[in-house]
Amino acid sequence: MRTIPFVHWIANAAARLVGPHGAVTQEARNAACSRQSVYNHAVKVKAAVEAEHGGGPTRAELIARIESLERENNQLWEWLFQTIEFPRIKQQMFTAVALGMGVSLNQVRILLAILLGARAAPSRSTIHRWAQAAGRAAGVVLEKLDHACRLFVLVGCLDEIFFHRRPVLVGVEPHSMVWFLGKKADNRRGSTWFAELQHWSSLRYVTSDAGTGLQAGIAQLQRHQRATDQVPVEKGLDVFHTKREVHRVLNTMWQHVERYWELAEEASRAVEKRRQQGLSVRGKTHSEHRAWEKASRVFNLYEKKEAVWKRVEQALDVFRPDGQLNDRAWAEQQVAWALPRLAGSEWSKVRRLLQNKESFTFLDRLHDQLDQLSLPETLRHALVRLWWLRQQLPRKSAGTAAGGYRHAVWLVQRVFCEKLDPQWRESYRRVAAVLRQTVRASSAVECMNSVLRMHQSRHRTLTPDLLNLKRLYWNTRVFHGGKRKGLCPYEHLGVKLPTYDFWSLLQAEMQAALAQAKVDAKSKNGTIAA
């Protein structure tokens, strides 16, 4: 705390610097301070004067600068609390996840430049090295995970998709949506499919289209299993592709209908125009009549074929229109009725698919699984009926009279089940599980093919390593909606892992792959130099 006024500081400085001999002692007595204080005041006053008039920043300027720096420092601290730490390991994680989601290398580079700035962002070559390491690491991780999944993959939906004329063999477990097979192969022959499928020894049922190579591979797998005293896998023909072929034929027929209809309308406009001009329409009305006859004939043919298909389509459903459980005998009866009515070369493929015994394998499998529940036949039929009635119930928002009637019928059937067995709920859950998990179409693998097509549109090419990275990401990705919400495919399949996090599974192997890549690069450079 200052006890001596500044005036005495200046007087003390004057006595010390320019005063005669004895001035310091006299001024110390006048200011009531010690001689040392006089010397200190002289030093401080001299320094203050030199600082003020020495050509440097003034005191006011220094104070203003300090205040500005303090404000800047406070702002930087506020920004620091809002920033995200983004070290090199985080950048590698970002790259691996983005590539797994289908983002291209160039897009990853742009996003990292936005986050880090153009100068701090890694180069494209660096990102490419990370991508290669992540793909190799994913292959190592998947080799272990596939081994753990083999006991749990009992049903598979199989298909192939082409990228740059090279097939990718795809297999998906439909209930969990685990992508268990994603192999970029040189061909799609039966031997190639067999080499990939024979590792999945727990497969009991597969569904696919009628592709020659795929069917040959499944047949070879069945022969191998019989020769080694294993239970041969059941094979079902995909209902989805059968329906798609029917819709293709019907669309072609409808295009003919539209073309003839347009010609008939054009003929009618020509006749009407001549009438308006006062010209004779003799001969033109006959052409108009013939045009409409052709259009009507083609339209009626389309309606007949469509009606035939709507009836035979019911043979490919789990339940008949009356709510009874479908079976092979009834389904084949509907097909036998429809075949003569689907004549013509354009329907040849549809007829061949419908006549294939494997089109109704799912019905045989369904009845076998229900029989294995060991329930009384009356109770089993009642529970199956209850499940079907529950599927017919409208949504809560649909408060219609028909909805009320259906709800009443369902309640009556429920009471009937309770009278048959007071402990009916547990049996119902078992029956519902069988009905709910019936697989008659390879929609799951078609879903996966759609994802792969989307990814292919963003990448120049899908390498085997990149496919492995995408497969690992898909199988560890948590579903955000639908009946699988909240869990990833591996969890739905029942595979027990220490963690299901994509980066946690990949990180260690990716660092090892990066280290190995550096060693290989040094070895290559040394060889070139030598």
Kindly give the residue locations of the regions a language model identified:
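Inter-helix linker motif
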Residues: 223-255, 259
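Active-site proximal helix-loop segment of RNase H-like, two-metal nucleases, encompassing DDE(D)
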Residues: 49, 252-270, 434, 444-462, ...
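Mobile genetic element proteins and their domesticated derivatives, centered on retroelements
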Residues: 12-13, 27, 38-41, 95, ...
